[in-house]
Curated annotation (Swiss-Prot):
NCBIfam families recorded: PRK13670.1
GO cellular component: cytoplasm
Keyword terms, alphabetized: ATP-binding, Cytoplasm, Ligase, Nucleotide-binding, RNA-binding, tRNA processing, tRNA-binding
Protein name in the entry: tRNA(Met) cytidine acetate ligase
InterPro entries given in the database record: Rossmann-like_a/b/a_fold, tRNA(Met)_cyd_acetate_ligase
Reactions listed under catalytic activity: cytidine(34) in elongator tRNA(Met) + acetate + ATP = N(4)-acetylcytidine(34) in elongator tRNA(Met) + AMP + diphosphate
Segments passing through the bilayer: none
Binding site residues for ATP: 7-20, 101, 163, 188
Stored Pfam families: HIGH_NTase1 (PF05636)
Disulfide topology: none
Molecular function GO terms recorded: ATP binding; ligase activity, forming carbon-nitrogen bonds; tRNA binding
Length: 419
């Protein structure tokens, strides 16, 4: 069974995602669509709109066949680490191809950029850092450097838009890992990431949809019908994360002091002081981010740093986990066709597949050996995923007493597509 891989957040699953899913199957000639999806905290440094099980349910009801979770260290990371972790998960599952959306839609142009960044990586990093110190923003600085090195006009290089940037990192990850997955890209339809407008086919950006939900507006026409029901249920039960709760939890962590903050991942010299100063007076989450942000770091980078603080992510450990790569595959759900694929691909799978967390410790011990470094890192990676679920539950106003150790009680979803 030919399988196409999709790297996703589904925050939430909307009409643009449905287009991407269907176009990816067609482009790759695939019978099965396999999604690796972020868990409770996302690449841009924010909690997901819906918990990972509801988002997996939306995906499966809308036609995805397999959903596996991207572990926290990669889900809430910079684009290169996010891309590499996701590519490694799909490769370990035995997926044949990878199809991603991009503003460019030009695979050749994206591959040329990926090759340039691989071959001239040190030069790009050094020159970009120089421009950042002069006050230029990161995306513009990297585009200018790549234009200078390639001899192209910066405006012709697809390095500004978010999906192009991720696409280039997926291509770099394929090269770096030696993956045999064949890449495809399809053009994004409708609104860009930061655009609140609705495009043809009722396609809006995920951020635009979240803004509408926050303002109490209806979004039914922007989502496939099966996703509408899932979002409506979470909305009625007050299970969207609350920014005020997020802000208060972050303040409690920041008030532990600068020595503590300096032990955490990406809390660099100077940021710890800005954090403690901002925590003393900030009125809400957005004000906290605004007060900490400095020119050389993007807003997204600051938000990710705050998620590391919330989840107590130690610097030395995170560096080791990112270097190791994903050490298990957490199955969130599958369709009948997806289960057939997983069974057929079992012998090709290169990482342990976790379906029951009550048995994961013995499963990891058998796979890696009880005294191995990989076993130690796998347990640490698992603990971060479990911590993310516990902390996410603290952000939900309507949490009703379901165990915060929910990871141990949720079996993989078994769902037929509804469309």
């Amino acid at each position: 069974m030919r399988a196409v891989g999709l790297i996703t957040e589904y925050n939430p699953f909307h009409n643009g995602h449905l287009h991407h899913l269907r176009a990816s199957r067609e482009a790759a000639g695939a019978e099965v669509a396999v999604a690796v999806m972020s868990g409770h905290f996302l690449q841009r440094g924010e909690p997901a709109l819906l918990d990972k099980w509801r988002r997996a349910e939306m995906a499966l009801r809308c036609g995805v066949d397999v959903v596996v979770e991207l572990p926290f260290p990669f889900a809430c990371a910079s684009a290169p680490h996010f891309a590499r972790g996701a590519v490694q998960c799909l490769d370990a599952l035995g997926v044949d191809s990878l199809c991603f959306g991009s503003e460019s839609g030009d695979l050749g142009a994206l591959q040329r950029c990926a090759q340039l960044l691989e071959e001239c990586g040190e030069q790009v990093a050094e020159r970009t850092a120089t421009l950042l110190r002069r006050g230029m923003h990161y995306a513009a600085a990297r585009s200018q450097v790549c234009a200078e090195l390639s001899g192209c006009d910066a405006a012709t290089l697809p390095l500004h838009q978010p999906n192009n940037i991720l696409g280039i990192e997926y291509l770099r990850a394929l090269r770096a890992t030696g993956s045999a997955m064949q890449p495809f890209t399809i053009s994004r339809l409708g609104a860009g990431y930061h655009d609140d407008a609705v495009g043809p086919g009722n396609i809006a950006s995920a951020s635009g949809i979240r803004k509408r939900l926050a303002m109490g507006e209806t979004v039914d026409e922007l989502l496939p019908a099966p996703a509408v029901d899932v979002v409506a249920g979470a909305r009625a039960d007050r299970l969207f994360p609350d920014e005020d709760l997020l802000h208060r939890l972050l303040l409690a962590q920041i008030f532990r002091g600068r020595d503590y903050l300096q032990s955490l991942y990406q809390v660099e010299s100077g940021i710890d002081a800005r954090l403690t100063d901002a925590a003393a007076t900030s009125r809400d989450w957005q004000a906290l981010v605004d007060a900490v942000k400095v020119r050389q770091f993007t807003r997204t980078r600051i938000q990710r740093t705050l998620m590391y603080i919330l989840n107590d992510v130690r610097g030395d450990l995170m560096a080791s986990l990112l270097a190791a790569g994903p050490l298990y595959l957490r199955l969130l759900g599958s369709s009948p066709r997806g289960r057939a694929f997983l069974g057929a691909a079992r012998k090709r799978r290169r990482l342990p597949m976790v379906t029951n967390l009550s048995r994961i410790y013995s499963q990891l011990k058998r796979t890696y050996g009880p005294r191995s470094e990989d076993y130690r890192l796998a347990l640490a990676m698992l603990e971060l995923d479990l911590r993310a679920t516990r902390n996410y539950s603290l952000l939900l106003p309507g949490w009703s007493g379901v165990s915060r150790e929910r990871d141990f009680f949720e079996a993989p979803l078994d769902i037929h597509s509804a469309i």
